[in-house]
Design a protein with these regions (language model features):
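Bacterial N-terminal signal peptides that target proteins for export
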Residues: 1-6
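N-terminal signal peptide c-region/cleavage motif recognized by signal peptidases
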Residues: 10, 15-17
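Sequence/structural signature of beta-propeller domains
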Residues: 21-437
């Protein structure tokens, strides 16, 4: 067994700690123990495919608010990283599935954060192989998304090229599920669901319209821009508020896309709440016939300003959802990370309004590190994961989950102020948490 995983007697000393800390109200807190970690350096780049347009051999031209064609001609103020740079950064991990034998499917998001600055960021997902003992990450395979058969229902950045690779100005992929030989990807611009084959070729793009309601964000390509003075209508999904999480049923038939931000009710002019909680919609989609169910569940946020990071089902209808605040760092900066949790939910456990019960949680700002495995050290035996966007969680085995950050390269500096975050991957022992009732 790997030394990083062989905690031995030390784990038994934490047995009492791993029992739930009951609270008078709400879900119980369970302990999480660091078992292993690996890192992919922030400055990891991939070459664009040979058949991609020449302009995609460099990325980051539009991140300063204007065009910068000179390589390394502008520096990101948060991290000092100079851009644009040759190649495509391997960053922005925004969805994960464990494939077994330390192999993981990881989705990269739209690139540099929004539609306007990411037209030279290529969309991709990767199969990564972890060497937990060495703390290193191998890139087994990279799949770039493309639309050679002209399936996408709107013009794309590379519209008139032969290969028609997709970019971060076309979609913002934030969640992924393997289904058979293909993959379904949840997007935030539409929000859309996108099916691609094993080579990344788009097979279909499905709009969101459960119950006959069209879900549209401000970035939806079919959103009409009103004339001056006119009221904007038809926008009910927040910008960067689409399918940040998307779970898959154990039988592989149903997807459960989860909005990152609350649905906007045009009639009331307010974000959706039930009782005293701001809620996020959990939808149902049948992959066999590509249709939406009318069923809607609701995930209750602990704070209206929070967001979710990922959602995966691991047993029956039981699943894991990351909920986080929008802050980073644990070094005393003005807006430090404070709320980074993973909640246990069950799709079969809702109230009369369809609001999910939060059964239990772990705190990613309070991870036990009895074996001192944290690569930059822990404080008083506690390891923290103080990233603004933590967007990856999945079950690895009966007692273990994998968690990873979206490092928003080169802008996030959660681990160390002024230094671009690496892609960090951790294994957590959460045996009691996974069994919580």
């Amino acid at each position: 067994m790997l030394k990083a995983l062989a905690l031995g007697v030390s784990l038994s000393l934490l047995a009492s700690l791993s029992m739930a800390q009951d609270t008078a109200e709400g879900p119980a807190k369970f302990e999480a123990v660091l078992k292993a970690n690996a890192q992919l350096p922030a400055q990891t780049f991939l070459p664009a495919p040979m058949d991609a347009p020449a302009g995609l051999q460099m990325s980051g031209r539009f991140t300063s608010g204007t065009r910068v064609e000179t390589p390394y001609g502008w520096a990101n103020p948060a991290s000092g990283i100079a851009m644009p740079f040759p190649g495509q950064p391997l960053q922005g991990m925004s969805g994960v599935r464990s494939l077994g034998e330390d192999r993981f499917l990881f989705l990269t998001d739209n690139g540099f954060g929004n539609k306007a600055n990411s037209s030279d960021a290529m969309l991709m997902f990767n199969i990564l192989k972890m060497d937990w003992e060495a703390g290193k990450v191998g890139i087994e395979k990279t799949i770039f998304l493309k639309d050679p058969n002209r399936v996408v229902p709107f013009p794309i950045v590379t519209e008139h090229s032969e290969s028609r690779y997709l970019t971060g100005a076309d979609f913002d992929p934030e969640s992924i599920q393997p289904v058979g030989d293909n993959y379904w990807i949840g997007d935030e611009f539409g929000p859309w669901l996108i099916e691609v084959d094993a080579e990344g070729v788009v097979l279909q793009v499905v709009k969101t319209n459960p119950g006959g309601v069209d879900y549209k964000s401000p970035d939806n390509q079919f959103t009409s821009q009103p004339a001056a003075g006119a009221v904007v209508t038809g926008i009910n999904t927040g910008r960067s508020g689409g399918y940040e999480g998307m779970a898959q049923s154990m039988d592989g038939i149903t997807l459960y896309p989860l909005l990152e931000k609350p649905f906007f009710d045009e009639a009331s002019g307010a974000l959706e709440t039930i009782g005293d909680k701001t809620v996020l919609r959990v939808l149902e989609f049948n992959v066999a016939d590509a249709t939406w169910s009318d069923t809607v569940r609701y995930y209750p946020l602990e704070d209206a300003g929070n967001a979710i990071g990922d959602f995966n089902i691991f047993e029956g209808t039981r699943g894991l959802i990351i909920e986080r605040d929008n802050n980073e760092g644990d070094d005393g900066r003005e807006k430090s990370a404070a709320f980074k949790r993973i909640y246990l939910v069950d799709l079969a456990r809702t109230d009369e309004n369809g609001v999910l019960e939060k059964i239990a949680y772990i705190d990613l700002m309070d991870i036990q590190d009895p074996e001192a495995l944290a690569p930059r050290g822990s404080k008083d035996g506690v390891f923290t994961f103080p990233f603004v966007t933590i967007e990856d969680v999945d079950l690895v085995d009966a007692t273990t989950i994998v968690v990873a950050n979206d490092n928003n390269y080169p802008g996030s500096t959660g681990r160390e102020a002024g230094r671009a975050d690496d892609n960090e991957y951790i294994l957590l022992d959460v045996a009691d948490f996974l069994k919580a009732e």
